Each structure stands twice: as C-alpha cells, then as structure tokens.
Amino acid sequence: MKMTTGRIAVLLTLVSSGSLLAHHSLANYDTTKAVRVKGTVVQFHAVNPHSIIFLEEKGTDGQTRRWAIEGPATNQLARLGFAKDVLKPGDLIEVCGYLPKETIMWQIANPDPSAISLAGRLFNAELMVMPDGKQQSWGDYGIHKCFAPGFVDQHTPK
C-alpha cells in the first residue's frame, strides 16, 4: 500500500509541475533575438505574479508605441533590492528582452477609473537601464543576448 501511495504522490508531483514550468518558460517569446526599447514609464504595477511596466516609446518615424513590459514578481523585486515604487511615471528607461512569437494585444484595467488603461505589445524584460543609468538584470532566460552583436534596436529604421 505504501509503495502505491508513494508512486501516486510522485506521479501527481510530476503532472502538476508541468503547468508551473509552462508558466515560467519563454515558449511564447522569440528568444532568437533580443530587442531593446527605450521610453517613458506611464504606469508601473508591482504585482504578482509579474510586475507590469507600461511604457511609451517615440519611434524614429515620430509615432508613439505603447508597450506592456512583463517583469519580476514583487518578491523578486525585493530580492533585487527594489521597492514597489522603483519606477515612477515620467521615468526614462531602456529595456532589453524578447517579443512574443505572435502579436499579442491586451489590456489591463486599473480599478481606478481615472487611471490610464493602456493596450500595448507584450514584452518580456531581461535587462533594464534604470533612470539613474545603472543596468539591472530583471530576468535569467538569456540576458547575454542583450549584450550580443545583432540585437534588434527598435530605434533603427527598418
């Protein structure tokens, strides 16, 4: 009986861990090339399971692009030494990370009806250049690509 119970416990653990790995994988993102975006913070939400930065970037074509950038959870922000108010509206930051394989448009509604609610392209942050100019790792899924030659700079005309 104990052997059967033990096998069932192992089986349940293996089956349930797949969804956790899927949630924390970069399968949705194109990790073959890192992308860099520079813009102004519109909103920052330090929430679980992932923080969200709403960023506006002025392109070389003069158009403003909106980005929804996924970052670390609140406990990881704390481990990195950041307070929940580390980013404020108006801060200029640069982010390096990965775009989704498919175009994802989505909206996060703020409970405060007077707050801005933005729709933007989802972007997974790996490296940030903070308002004070310091670089900070925000991920561990290939940050080396943010320094590698050939990364895609969103400011470069296509």
Protein language model annotation of sequence segments:
Residues 27-158:
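PEST-like low-complexity, intrinsically disordered acidic/proline/serine-rich tracts
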Residues 20-22, 27:
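Boundary at the C-terminal end of the N-terminal hydrophobic targeting segment
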Residues 9-19:
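Bacterial N-terminal signal peptides
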Residues 1-10:
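Bacterial N-terminal signal peptides that target proteins for export
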